[in-house]
């Protein structure tokens, strides 16, 4: 075959695979086969000097540009007017209603009833892509002033989900948002000398970086939502425009809603606000736009904004505030971690007074100092995180000093990697109390009525220094504890006695093996079936267990090497603790070996019971939808997982359909 023809075929094939993987989330080729074809293309291009402008090899160059050139947009990129209350949305809606009524009263060609299209308002950097009459990407530009932006074509090409060639023979400008996902952000920050402060800065800084190789390191993504300019037949509705964007292979978010009433809009605002922190990218609101294009054209624009759209803005996810102090706390493992004490600040509707700082390396890398103004970010975490400092606020600030002794017991601290530990396991109150509370917890030994206050008293007054000491407690001594009468003392002893008969997975979880949670404990028990087998397990055997990686495997091996660990386990067994494992016979079913996600409220099952049912049928129950998901069982008020499953073409079952299958 002619080498130029072969290059053209390889380019077409590789671009198809990229679309499947980065846009559809479902690849039809293995990574190995893709790499083989990619490097075949690289070699052919070197040999012949023939390179197509839309070849995947042109995505990343080792180039540093001298400057950004200006680009004049064919159609202006408008800002949107903003609302922060439903009342402001109502006022905007009423203006639209009034316009529509007046127009239809005086015009022969009536406008259709108002219908709004709702999409997420992404918190990234707006980009405008231009495609020529052959469908080839020729320019990528920032929004800039709205009329003139900066040419960032080389940077835009590093975004792998953006098509370099599309099936369209009209000159086209399409608008979207370049974003950084939380995964890309965390990976970049784990390796970077200077960590990024937030996802938006990560995206904006990447596209406005003259070093294209640095842009590529940030692994940006993008969503597209608007055709700014298109030669040829115009669109009649926004939904028609969105369908066009999708059919041309551009990455789109799966959330698009049609609303006709304010009540419907309110429900969608509430829904997106609820799932906002579950997303793996930042949004700062919702865009509400009129669907009918003719109505849009007649409504027109103000000097700044289109009259036919408005953005509903959520509360900020990030804020700046003053770092007042650092508090050092001891965890169950003995790790001593810093917590920032902040000047109270409102963040995403919550008053934030504390934030995590991770460790001294993290503090040094981010340049955090006492008295400085710091950037605080709230995501899925219960406690927000400090991302960096405001450079202008550093004058007069103080260095954060690392403690040399344990803040709880005064023992000397030791370094292990980036963390510091207190090794006074038996005499350090926070360590022992948290260990006992974990051991007694519902998903561990399930000792009813046990509390942290009880654990504190057992440590302070009854000299409990190990979990096995719980099984040596005496009735008379319990009566010496605060608020412990005869009934409460006996109830606690009965609950401790009852806990002796436990499942092996609960016992394993109760031991507090580092990095071993409830699910991992269950998976380990299924694989090894006895404590003795697990104690003898090799590294290779451990990593063969589903979801057990190198770190977890090493944690388990190190845990069972400890002489004290084995002593405690043997003592627990000698005191009558009887962990047992009953091998459940898994019935043949359509769910055998399948990955299943449950979303919404089911009529006949709690979350625990449906999980147990699915596992008894041989299924793996997952908490998130991906291209590896086989089924989604959807109940009432199914949320974003349902939407994602639909967009990926995953089989969605109602509760009734699920029961019919089994």
UniProtKB/Swiss-Prot annotation:
Belongs to the NAD-dependent DNA ligase family. LigA subfamily. Zn(2+) binds at residues 406, 409, 422, 428. NCBIfam families: dnlj (TIGR00575), PRK07956.1 (NF005932). This is DNA ligase. It is an enzyme of class 6 (ligase). GO terms for cellular component: cytosol. HAMAP family: DNA_ligase_A (MF_01588). The keyword Metal-binding applies. Residues 586-662 form the BRCT domain. GO terms for biological process: DNA repair; DNA replication. It catalyses: NAD(+) + (deoxyribonucleotide)n-3'-hydroxyl + 5'-phospho-(deoxyribonucleotide)m = (deoxyribonucleotide)n+m + AMP + beta-nicotinamide D-nucleotide. Its cofactor is Mg(2+); Mn(2+). The active site is at 121 (n6-amp-lysine intermediate). It comes from Clostridium perfringens (strain SM101 / Type A). NAD(+) binds at residues 31-35, 79-80, 143, 177, 313. DNA ligase that catalyzes the formation of phosphodiester linkages between 5'-phosphoryl and 3'-hydroxyl groups in double-stranded DNA using NAD as a coenzyme and as the energy source for the reaction. It is essential for DNA replication and repair of damaged DNA. Its EC number is 6.5.1.2. One of its GO terms (molecular function) is metal ion binding. Keywords: DNA damage, DNA repair, DNA replication, Ligase, Magnesium, Manganese, Metal-binding, NAD, Zinc. The keyword NAD applies.
């Amino acid at each position: 075959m002619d080498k130029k023809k072969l290059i053209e075929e390889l380019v077409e094939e590789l671009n198809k695979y990229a679309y499947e993987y980065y846009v559809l989330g479902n690849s039809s080729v293995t990574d190995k086969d893709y790499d083989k074809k990619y490097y075949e293309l690289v070699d052919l291009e070197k040999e012949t000097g023939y390179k197509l402008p839309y070849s995947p090899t042109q995505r990343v160059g080792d180039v540093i540009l001298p400057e950004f050139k200006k680009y004049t947009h064919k159609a202006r990129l408008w800002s949107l007017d903003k609302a922060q209350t439903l009342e402001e949305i109502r006022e905007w809606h009423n203006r639209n209603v009034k316009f529509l009524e007046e127009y239809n009263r005086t015009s022969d060609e009536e406008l259709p009833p108002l219908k709004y299209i709702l999409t997420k308002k992404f918190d990234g950097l707006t980009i405008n892509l231009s495609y020529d009459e052959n469908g080839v990407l020729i320019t990528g530009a920032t929004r800039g002033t709205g009329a003139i932006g900066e040419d960032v074509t080389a940077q835009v090409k590093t975004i792998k989900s953006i098509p370099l060639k599309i099936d369209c023979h009209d000159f086209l400008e399409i608008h979207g948002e370049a974003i950084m996902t939380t995964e890309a952000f965390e990976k970049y920050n784990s390796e970077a000398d200077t960590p990024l402060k937030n996802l938006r800065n990560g995206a904006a800084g990447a596209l406005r970086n003259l070093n294209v190789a640095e842009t590529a390191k940030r692994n940006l993504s993008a969503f597209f939502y608007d055709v700014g300019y298109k030669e040829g037949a115009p669109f009649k509705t926004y939904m028609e425009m969105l369908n066009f964007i999708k059919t041309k292979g551009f990455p789109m978010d799966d959330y698009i809603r049609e609303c006709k009433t304010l009540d419907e809009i309110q429900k969608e605002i509430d829904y997106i606000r609820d799932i906002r922190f579950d997303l793996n990218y930042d949004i700062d609101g919702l865009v509400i736009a009129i669907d009918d294009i003719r109505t849009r054209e007649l409504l027109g624009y103000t000097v700044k904004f289109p009259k036919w759209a408005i953005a509903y803005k959520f509360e900020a996810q990030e804020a700046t505030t003053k770092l007042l102090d650092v508090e050092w706390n001891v965890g169950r493992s003995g790790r001593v971690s810093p917590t920032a004490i902040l000047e109270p600040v409102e963040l995403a509707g919550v008053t934030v007074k504390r934030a995590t700082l991770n460790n001294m390396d993290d503090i040094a890398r981010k340049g955090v100092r006492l008295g400085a103004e710091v950037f605080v970010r709230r995501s899925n975490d219960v406690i927000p995180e400090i991302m960096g400092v405001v450079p202008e606020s550093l004058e007069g600030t103080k260095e954060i000093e690392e403690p040399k002794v344990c803040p709880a017991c005064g023992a000397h601290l030791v370094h292990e990697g980036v963390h510091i530990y207190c090794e006074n396991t038996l005499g350090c109150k926070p360590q022992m109390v948290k260990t006992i509370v974990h051991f007694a917890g519902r998903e561990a030994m399930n000792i009813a009525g046990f509390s942290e206050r009880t654990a504190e008293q057992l440590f302070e007054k009854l000299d409990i220094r190990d979990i096995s000491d719980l099984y040596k407690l005496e009735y008379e001594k319990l009566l010496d504890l605060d608020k412990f009468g005869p009934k409460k003392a006996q109830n606690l002893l009965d609950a401790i006695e009852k806990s002796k008969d436990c499942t092996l997975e609960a016992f394993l979880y109760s031991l507090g093996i580092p990095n071993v949670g409830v699910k991992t404990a269950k998976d380990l028990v299924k694989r090894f079936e006895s404590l003795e087998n697990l104690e003898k397990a090799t590294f290779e055997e451990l990593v063969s267990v589903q979801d057990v990686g190198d770190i977890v495997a090493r944690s388990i091996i190190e845990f069972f090497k400890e002489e004290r660990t084995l002593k405690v386990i043997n003592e627990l067994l000698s005191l009558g603790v009887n962990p047992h494992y009953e091998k459940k016979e898994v019935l043949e079913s359509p769910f055998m070996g399948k990955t299943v996600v449950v979303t919404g409220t089911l009529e006949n099952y709690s979350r625990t019971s449906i999980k147990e049912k699915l596992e008894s049928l041989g299924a793996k129950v997952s908490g998130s939808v991906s291209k590896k998901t086989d089924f989604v069982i959807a109940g009432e008020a199914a949320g974003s997982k349902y939407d994602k499953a639909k967009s990926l073409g995953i089989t969605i079952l109602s509760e009734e359909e699920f029961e019919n299958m089994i």
